[in-house]
């Protein structure tokens, strides 16, 4: 038990160190950042498939109703990390970037009969980008040069994290429901600088900052119906409450004289600037004899009516206010499955899990009035049993994931990610007979 607590504390501190390196995407400059997958190790092998799954030896926090299925004598601790390589392509200009991230730390145990409890730490979104462009200003009127170049530099960092506590209860066989309550916190920092080669033209900087601290509520239910002696079907439903985050955002507009270094700063602030969307999920999972599980998930995030801060106008007419037209509703469809010949078989490969999944996610960002990137992704994964004299219930989950984000006239992203998750399944409260 002490080892588990120490591991959890160490992983928690490590997550804080890696949290801001979870993305290199320029698209993380919009909204709350690049939205995190939030799936655990076994889900990631199926590309995030989750709503209809309830496992006795895995933590599925994406539907809290599943906690009721956790083994009565087990304590499950699961932590995962990812390594990713991303290729960015804009008009034939290609750049590669790589980064690593601790993705999640979750745990679960049986509290009472038919009642499971889970808690954990995971990212909600990531902000991390740094890019620039340079152009000529043709025939720019200037005392020092007939032609001037200007450059725009964009950078950002931060993200949102959440720690949650949840419970799931099965009041009667086949039906369960549960809830997670989370504390959501983090900072969003974004910086834009417009500078000119002509020293007579001021450099303009726009620094946007926000600090968010609020709650998040998720609810879930599952119903399992036996079709035959070997086949059953599970319907999973989830709902996440959308609400204002009661957080302010600030913008500092800085004009700097390139010759004298003298700056003039104008400060703007918007109260209650950010909001979480209402989110609905529905999933169906077919289970054949606990060997083959195939499922489909659909998720809807209601972003369309959410407002977002916008700086507009020039000079004394500059305004910083909430505006619409930045988002669309986000739809995600996932299909995947898991095959294992049987956990009680003696053969090593018979006890392995083989997983696969594919997803399509519709654009939810509006960039310069046009639809942002849509996302295609696919994954393959395995669950490798850890067998030794002390414990044969733990699992090493490894998966490979490909993600493509693209939109007409915008940057194309191709990301290859390796996910590694280690699920410790510790046997608690067992009575041992001494001869």
Which functions belong to the PLM regions below?
Residues 20-44, 110-435:
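Outer-membrane beta-barrel porins/channels
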Residues 17-125:
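N-terminal, post-signal peptide beta-strand-biased segments of exported outer-membrane/organellar beta-barrel
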Residues 13-14, 74, 89, 184, ...:
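Single-residue recognition of alpha-helix boundary sites
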Residues 1-24, 435:
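Bacterial Sec-dependent N-terminal signal peptides
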Residues 9, 57, 270-271:
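Residue-level detector of alpha-helical transmembrane segments in integral membrane proteins
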């Amino acid at each position: 038990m002490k080892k588990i607590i120490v591991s959890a504390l160490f992983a928690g501190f490590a997550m804080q160190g890696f949290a801001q390196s979870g993305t290199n995407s320029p698209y993380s400059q919009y909204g709350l950042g690049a939205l995190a997958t939030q799936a655990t190790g076994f889900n990631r092998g199926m590309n995030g498939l989750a709503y209809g799954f309830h496992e006795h030896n895995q933590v599925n926090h994406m539907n809290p109703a599943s906690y009721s299925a956790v083994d009565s004598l087990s304590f499950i601790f699961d932590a995962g990390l990812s390594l990713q390589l991303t290729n960015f392509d804009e008009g034939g200009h290609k750049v590669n970037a790589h980064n690593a991230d601790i993705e999640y730390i979750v745990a679960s145990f049986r509290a009472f009969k038919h009642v499971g409890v889970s808690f954990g730490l995971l990212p909600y979104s990531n902000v991390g980008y740094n890019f620039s462009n340079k152009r000529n200003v043709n025939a720019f009127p200037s005392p020092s040069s007939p032609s001037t170049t200007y450059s725009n530099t964009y950078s950002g960092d931060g993200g949102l994290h959440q720690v949650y506590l949840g419970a799931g209860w099965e009041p009667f066989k086949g039906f369960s429901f549960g809830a997670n309550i989370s504390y959501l916190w983090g900072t969003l920092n974004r910086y834009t600088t417009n500078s000119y080669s002509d020293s007579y033209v001021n450099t303009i900087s726009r620094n946007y900052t926000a600090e968010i601290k609020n709650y998040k509520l998720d609810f879930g239910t599952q119903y399992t119906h036996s079709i035959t002696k070997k086949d059953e079907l599970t319907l999973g439903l989830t709902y996440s409450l959308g609400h204002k985050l009661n957080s302010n955002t600030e913008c500092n507009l800085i004009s700097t004289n390139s010759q004298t270094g003298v700056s003039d700063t104008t400060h703007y602030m918007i109260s209650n600037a950010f909001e979480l969307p209402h989110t609905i999920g529905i999933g169906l999972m077919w289970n054949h004899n606990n060997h083959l599980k195939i499922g489909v998930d659909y998720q809807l995030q209601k972003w369309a009516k959410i407002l977002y801060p916008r700086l507009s106008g020039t000079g004394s007419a500059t305004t910083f206010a909430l505006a619409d037209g930045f988002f669309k509703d986000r739809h995600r469809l996932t299909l995947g499955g898991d095959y294992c010949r049987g956990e009680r078989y003696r053969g090593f490969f018979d006890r392995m899990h083989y997983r696969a999944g594919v997803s399509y996610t519709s654009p939810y960002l509006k960039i310069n009035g046009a639809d942002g990137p849509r996302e295609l992704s696919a994954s393959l994964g395995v669950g490798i049993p850890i067998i030794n004299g002390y414990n044969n219930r733990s699992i090493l989950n490894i998966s490979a994931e490909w993600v493509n984000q693209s939109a007409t006239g915008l940057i194309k992203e191709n990301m290859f990610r390796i996910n590694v998750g280690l699920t410790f399944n510790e046997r608690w409260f067992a009575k041992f007979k001494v001869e």
